[in-house]
């Protein structure tokens, strides 16, 4: 609009001519595979925590944000192109139709709650609590599992993008579709996170190997 006004000489110079946007990368916490397994296998004897844990694990294996996962109904589950069960529905944020194949753990959780009173009375796939309470319960679960990271409803989606998809060599274009991104540059942010993790892991491995080598040299000198 401003450029159009300058073109028509309604104004001589754009007031934003010297304005430059700056962007700051936001830290995106995610669970690694060990943390994900620890949470999934943890025995929780408090029902509300067990339900939130299961809903969170479901999001870790589907990439659904809280608002999308909470709205899922049994009607959204259908047979996909491969003959297996998929979730086929519109994503809340983009209103795009998405097709998400259900991985075994996600399917297991759906089966677990198909006869849950809340799910049956509200036609929902999962017994999800309010967003505010949900994050509070996630903090309790993290403490019980010995996970130091701050868990939120967003952490599960980041976990799906990094640990479940990209670290298992799922192509960036496929990850983009599964995450419902309209611009691959958004997905590439997760690619950079994965590269950083690989770099850190290799640095730790390098330090470990150097330590082993130093011990071997030390033992050789003693002998």
Describe the residue ranges of each PLM region.
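C-terminal catalytic core of Y-nucleophile DNA break-rejoin enzymes
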Residues: 25, 92-111, 119-140
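Basic, Lys/Arg- and aromatic-enriched nucleic-acid-binding interface segment
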Residues: 7, 11-66, 168
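Non-catalytic DNA-binding core/recognition domains of DNA-processing enzymes
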Residues: 1-4, 19, 102
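Short basic/aromatic active-site micro-motif
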Residues: 51-52, 128-132, 148-168
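Catalytic-site neighborhood detector that most strongly recognizes the C-terminal catalytic loop/helix
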Residues: 91-95, 131, 179-204
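C-terminal secondary-structure termini that scaffold catalytic or DNA-interacting sites
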Residues: 117-120, 205-223
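C-terminal catalytic core of tyrosine-transesterase DNA break-rejoin enzymes
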Residues: 57, 61, 67, 157-182, ...
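Conserved tyrosine-mediated DNA breakage-rejoining catalytic core shared by Y-recombinases
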Residues: 29-31, 35, 71-111
């Amino acid at each position: 609009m401003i450029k159009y006004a300058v073109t028509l000489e309604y104004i001589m110079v754009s007031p934003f001519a010297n304005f430059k946007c700056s962007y700051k990368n936001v830290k995106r916490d995610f669970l690694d595979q060990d943390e994900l397994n620890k949470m999934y296998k943890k025995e929780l004897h408090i029902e509300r925590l067990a339900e939130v844990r299961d809903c969170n694990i479901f999001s870790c294996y589907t990439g659904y944000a809280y608002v999308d996962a909470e709205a899922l109904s049994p009607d959204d589950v259908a047979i996909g192109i491969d003959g297996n069960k998929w979730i086929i529905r519109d994503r809340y944020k983009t209103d795009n139709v998405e097709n998400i194949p259900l991985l075994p753990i996600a399917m297991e959780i759906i089966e677990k709650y198909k006869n849950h009173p809340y799910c049956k009375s509200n036609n929902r796939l999962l017994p999800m609590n309010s967003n505010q309470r949900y994050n509070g319960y996630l903090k309790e679960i993290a403490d019980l599992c010995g996970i130091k990271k701050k868990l939120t409803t967003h952490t599960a989606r980041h976990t799906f993008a990094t640990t479940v998809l990209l670290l298992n060599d799922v192509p960036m274009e496929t990850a983009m579709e599964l995450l419902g991104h309209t611009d691959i540059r958004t997905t590439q942010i997760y690619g950079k996170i994965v590269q950083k993790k690989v770099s850190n892991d290799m640095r730790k491995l390098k330090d470990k190997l150097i330590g082993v080598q130093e011990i071997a040299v030390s033992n050789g000198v003693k002998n």
